[in-house]
């Protein structure tokens, strides 16, 4: 590689590094002849080569300058020497002195010519010659400085990357955890995963709860719209006290129960009946399930739940048997319908004496037979132990449910579970027909009259909607998701049956095309054991909804209550509870052109800022039926707020 620089005389000198030479070889500068022909150059290009900093504007003056800078002293014995040519027969010493005099005269004449030439040049041109020379040198120095800075930054980046990479590798090797594309760092009871995945996923800190829902798939949490709310110092507190009395062998009688309603209504009823059995020190016979409800599902308790786990988990709380002892099989049970929203005193004073008298009692209803509030802590904690630990779904439901969760988590991404309760039975029951045709509205009214135990027959659907009593339509749901800035690429799991109304799902499908359900995610072979078993299918939906990053429900039914309460219990996972009354007013204002989309979105986000599943205390109401359900919010009762010291101990 060649390098060059300007010599002190302005002539570029080229240094060539060659393996043939131990040091750099300097090329000869261009030579110029002395004598009368010195006024012109053999090549016009010599102007810019020979002049140090010249601009070539005055060729004659430049040539003079070049002659000064490159005069060559010839040896005295050269054939061209003036001494030899001018003094052939004279005294050598005199000739030498004469030659010296002539040489001094020649140099004097040359200096005089140069000075005159410079004086004849305009002063600006002279200054320009020198300023251009300095400018050129400054440019070279700036270039070298720039190259040096770039080199320094490059070396620094390489060193820093190498150090950081070695530090990360060292941390990973210390943990001895290695799976493709994911680095795991264990910390206390949680695993922290750093995602370093594809182009569409930003590197995100993800927490995987190792103790969530038993053996179910890991639940990931992301930032932005997918992030869970702050849970503060709250934690689960349902473990039995160490000082409690051991369960004795004696019993006051046997309880037979028939859990009524759909899947989640039956769950609540079973939880209450376990607590009632505890209050009365009774033995519970394995529950039977309602087969006469709207869904007409003939699944039994053992089909829906892991019955052996149920008995084992509660063995220290109550006695549970599969069936009545043989000596009591012939006894006619005493039939009793407990009063709704009752407290402990009612069961001890009014029901327990009857149980002791008849030994075997059959309770006809189980739903809402215990109050939400004002119960002993031991009773509340037991209800939660039943709901969140003992009532584990049967193996077929658990296994397929977890498969559906893994299929929803494509590339470990988040998904939203949407409980879109826009089904025919719900619309008929509530009398809501907004956006439906007149024919569809009439069909719903006829269905309402056909179901005898539905008390309300004539309902003003418009008024009910404005009061927040209707499930959101698919279009309204789409507007809500868009206003909250969920991306159109969001993966959504539909926790519901078929939506009612011709084309009612079109707006939601258009805005969010990645919508799935158990019938889409599972094969026909996988779903064949669940055909005609709506409660088992509801169990699948429950598992997928529970493990989602975000759960959104459009109507506050039993499924919504059960899932949101369970998600609160599992460290307050994000659950969007729409303010339907105010939201539909905003939708109407948007449709009527009274507000812009920007204003609409801003108001929707403000409206739901604190409706995301964050902790707050359930409070007693004037009427038990109007209170918030204990199973929708088990705080207080099953979730406790720790002190700072307790929180620190829990984290360590």
From Swiss-Prot:
Annotated spans, Disordered: 1-64, 78-102
**Cellular location of this protein?**
Membrane
Annotated residues that bind substrate are located at: 419-421
**GO molecular function annotations of the record:** glycosyltransferase activity
What's the chief localization of this chain? membrane
Q: Which GO BP annotation is one of this protein's? A: fucose metabolic process
Q: InterPro entries from the entry?
A: FucosylTrfase_pln (IPR024709), GDP-Fuc_O-FucTrfase (IPR019378)
Asked if the keyword Glycoprotein belongs to this entry, the reply reads yes
Which pathway does the database say it acts in?
Glycan metabolism
> Is Transferase a UniProt keyword of this protein?
yes
Q: Name one GO cellular component term.
A: chloroplast
Q: What is its EC number?
A: 2.4.1.-
Q: Where is the composition biased (Low complexity)?
A: 85-98
Superkingdom of origin organism: Eukaryota
> Where are the membrane-spanning stretches?
138-158
Q: Which residues are glycosylated?
A: 233, 460, 502
Membrane topology reported for the UniProt record: Single-pass type II membrane protein
Q: Which family does it belong to?
A: Belongs to the glycosyltransferase GT106 family.
Name of this chain's protein: O-fucosyltransferase 35
Organism for this UniProt entry:
Arabidopsis thaliana (Mouse-ear cress)
